[in-house]
Amino acid sequence: MTQKRVLIIEDDLDMIGLLKIILKRGGYEPISALGGKEGLRLLQEASVDLILLDLMMDDINGWEVLERIKADPALRMVPVIIVSARHQAEDPGQTETHSDQFEGYVVKPFVVRDLLTQIQEVIP
């Protein structure tokens, strides 16, 4: 069975490392991009089954990255799970505006089981 490839778009190296460990233990193939710009570039080069996307990044915020992904015909069908320190209630306008563009939302710090459950629901 082929492993599902998951792209982590995050600007915190420690969080990238943690997510890679979790994904590997969950049976996924993680690849990572340090920030939104690198994530968008990597998406042009690599095929992925899922994107884990941080919202608060220094170079491009996650909402803009999400908009660019969903505007690209080659990428718009790739599911996205938001992994952010911001609760949805902290950003209701953005969350409501983009609610049809992401498949899950996990708040940091998260319970590993909850993250893996959301991933399994999106890419079984």
Region roles according to the model:
Residues 64, 87-106, 113, 117-120:
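Alpha4 helix (beta4-alpha4-beta5 surface) of REC/receiver domains from two-component response regulators
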Residues 16, 58, 67, 76, ...:
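The feature encodes the CheY-like receiver
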Residues 17-25:
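Charged docking surfaces used in two-component/phosphorelay signaling
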Residues 32-41, 62:
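Helix N-cap/capping motif at the beta->alpha junctions
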